[in-house]
Amino acid sequence: MMQDLRLILIIVGAIAILALLVHGFWTSRKERSSMFRDRPLKRMKSSRNDDGDDDIEDNDDEGVGEVRVHRVNTAPGVGHGEQEAPRQSAQHQYQPPYASAQPRPQAPQPVEEPVRQPQTQPVHQQPVAQPQPVQQHQPVQPVQQPQPEPQTVQTQPAPPVEPEPVVEEAPVVEKPQRKETVIIMNVAAHHGTQLNGELLLNSIQQAGFKFGDMNIFHRHLSPDGSGPALFSLANMVNPGTFDPEMTGDFLTPGITIFMQVPSYGDELQNFKLMLQSAQHIADEVGGMVLDDQRRMMTPQKLREYQDRIREVKEANA
């Protein structure tokens, strides 16, 4: 929009300047032609006046004035020829004035031709092509753009939005961390001795353990090795694993049996089964059952284990 308006203003300004130049040129030419037309008449009038003045001055200089008759006293006896002599002299004397008084031949006057007025031919307006922008010396005043009038937009009131029923989310109750514990007991050889590997492996298998994950033995719910693991058996020597291809040709100071609580099923019943398996292995290899501190197992320690199991069960109930 701004570019179109600016282009229109430039075209209108160029046409106006061109019209002013044409009008000024035509006016000056008309005035100049009228001056040349009046100048010969003035010259002729001035020449005529000058000729009249010259004639008057010549007549004055030559002494042409009023004709006066003077009486001439002639002597008696003078012949007729004597009287004609002065007349001739007088005629000869007055001849120059008459000759000078003759009108001078006037210069041929120039024939004045009627000055023809220049016929104004109708100007056929040619289709104006878009001219190149003319560099005007006058500063172009900035075109004030019409300020947009603020339009009052009538907004229709939005339909009332019915509040959606707020569904109160149930408070998330953080579950307390599950309490866990590990029950540990050991079967070890007597002081200064070690358990025989072959005898130990036979007693472990008789107690229902199966070799499995982590290269240790596990006691499953079923003696044939099916079902979840209830407790496990590891070597007392680090890293606590057994050789999968062991042939019984090894010695060890003992084994460790451990159960994680809570576990599958009844933890107290699983604890009794673990204690029976430890006593069976100890009887077979000639060892003894120790607690988690590798001390002799006592009834007080057994009750402590049972209390720990009950506490975990109640905490997780």
Swiss-Prot record:
Acidic residues biased stretches: 51-64
InterPro entries: Cell_div_ZipA (IPR011919), ZipA_FtsZ-bd_C (IPR007449), ZipA_FtsZ-bd_C_sf (IPR036765)
Bridged cysteine pairs (disulfide): none
A GO BP entry: FtsZ-dependent cytokinesis
Topological domains annotated Cytoplasmic: 28-317
Subunit record text: Interacts with FtsZ via their C-terminal domains.
Designated name of the protein: Cell division protein ZipA
Organism: Enterobacter sp. (strain 638)
